[in-house]
A protein has these predicted regions:
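Membrane-interface amphipathic segments in extracytoplasmic regions
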Residues: 1-277
Length: 277
């Protein structure tokens, strides 16, 4: 059984280990190499996006479509397990948390395609969605524009890190030209890393974790996804300037410098479908 007592007991034991690390961030911000490295070093860790539910239920407005991919009983059990694990972690005397942030448009775009199956429920009603690239694109453009809850990404640190571990990244004054930041209170120590700078921070992450000779290992995620053709077509045709307002949201203005945010815009302006502001 997925949620057998023995399996949960072993997981809970790991959550209480002295050198335990919580990898806690919104999806698609580049944490896989950290997870892989911790596992290779036999450092107990737990990777989670939210302690409330499967992340997809927070991330998309078309929840009826999302629910078709999750068994009701398993989902209810999963939520109970998440709540139990959260309580265990909150009761620790001290906890180290690794979290990341990424260009918001890159985050949203990557996550949408990871969850692409959620948007093909309509394909059962319209066979052309599976046969014609332009029809498929128009369908996905509609889904991208209307079904993603963009507030989920902008509010993640308040809804998760602040609510569950009393770490408020917005209250602390930071130099947002730096590649990472640390936050601390009486129970939690957090390192917040810009995904774009992750590969150059081996020593800094190792120092935070008190791990000697820490070197990030490639997660070897497969690049040839089943959706690669429509992914490329979408990227060539979509007007990403519709999401440029995200760079002016409080979270991204706080964490990323003006120069970094302008560089993100410049990158997306190079895609053929994106219009100049």
């Amino acid at each position: 059984m997925k949620y057998s007592i023995a399996r949960q007991f072993e997981k809970n034991r790991k959550l209480r280990a002295d050198n335990f690390v919580l990898v806690y961030q919104m999806g698609k911000v580049g944490s896989s190499s950290i997870e892989h490295t911790l596992e290779a070093r036999n450092i107990p860790s737990y990777h989670i996006h939210t302690f409330d539910d499967h992340e997809e239920f927070h991330m998309y407005h078309n929840k009826k479509d999302v629910s078709k991919f999750f068994d009701f009983k398993n989902r209810a059990m999963y939520r109970l397990v998440l709540n139990q694990r959260k309580r265990i972690l909150q009761k620790r005397e001290q906890i180290k948390i690794v979290t990341l942030i990424r260009d918001p448009i890159a985050t949203v775009f990557s996550r949408f395609f990871q969850d692409l199956h959620l948007q093909f429920i309509e394909g059962k009603k319209n066979d052309a969605i599976h046969r014609d690239m332009e029809v498929t694109y128009k369908h996905l453009e509609h889904c991208f524009d209307n079904y993603i809850n963009l507030n989920y990404f902008a509010d993640w640190f308040d809804n998760e890190l602040k609510r569950n571990f009393s770490i408020d990244v917005m209250r602390q004054e930071i130099d947002n030209t730096q590649p990472f930041f640390t936050f601390n209170n009486h129970k939690a120590s957090v390192i917040l890393i810009k995904c774009e700078q992750l590969s150059s921070l081996d020593k800094e992450i190792g120092d935070f974790l008190n791990v000697d000779n820490f070197v990030l290992k490639n997660s070897n995620e497969a690049k040839n996804k089943w959706y690669s053709n429509i992914h490329q077509y979408f990227k060539q045709h979509y007007d990403f300037s519709k999401l440029f307002y995200m760079y002016d949201l409080p979270l991204y203005r706080h964490i990323y410098s003006q120069q970094e945010r302008e560089a993100f815009k410049t990158k997306w302006l190079k895609t053929p479908g994106t219009k100049s502001a």
